[in-house]
UniProtKB/Swiss-Prot annotation:
Glycans are attached at N84. It is found in: Secreted. GO terms for cellular component: extracellular space. Residues 37-56 are annotated as: Disordered. One of its GO terms (biological process) is negative regulation of cell differentiation. Keywords: Chondrogenesis, Developmental protein, Differentiation, Disulfide bond, Glycoprotein, Secreted, Signal. The keyword Chaperone does not apply. This is Noggin-2. It comes from Danio rerio. The gene is nog2. Belongs to the noggin family. Residues 1-23 form the signal peptide.
Amino acid sequence: MGSITRALPLLLLLLLCAHGTASQHHLRLRPLPSEGLPVPDLIENPDPEHDPREQDLSEKTLLKKLGSNFDANFMSIHLPAQLNASAPPELPRLPMPAELKKLDLTETPYGRRVKVGKKARRKFLQWLWMYTHCPVLYTWKDLGLRFWPRYIKEGNCFSERSCSFPEGMSCKPVKAVTKTFLRWYCQGFMRQKYCTWIQVQYPIISQCKCSC
């Protein structure tokens, strides 16, 4: 899992201006590796001088700048009415893993044969699949004024109990999707300060797995 998360770009931040006059600034994002998901909360400079102004927040302009990267399934311009975007965990909708289907319930670890009816076997496998399944739970998160759209639907692995029987293993992220947002970026000081919107990538957990 470490290689997956390290390969994902964390979102932020910085760099580099370059060539020519202030009207010709070019910004390039330098991604930082993420050691884990979900992305931890970003500690921002509280100085309002680093905030976008009202004229910098035109929805029409920013939608055009973000283009096809805008994904209403994972981002929202306005505060969503329902912050919890996931229903309570239920029976998985994905196909049951092959290793569960092939599980032999007619023999104990000590070699003793037991009789298990088809209905009982099906019920037990469904229970085991439900118990060991690791759903992704989504909630809306406010990234703040310096991101646009400022609301992101962030995924978390179910963590209220162990996912193994006996206990000991837990749900951990194994896959993520990357969404592109706009980040308000400023450089320079005083009269030399220049601010603009740049595109940054934000990884979101898309699949979890029961793991050590």
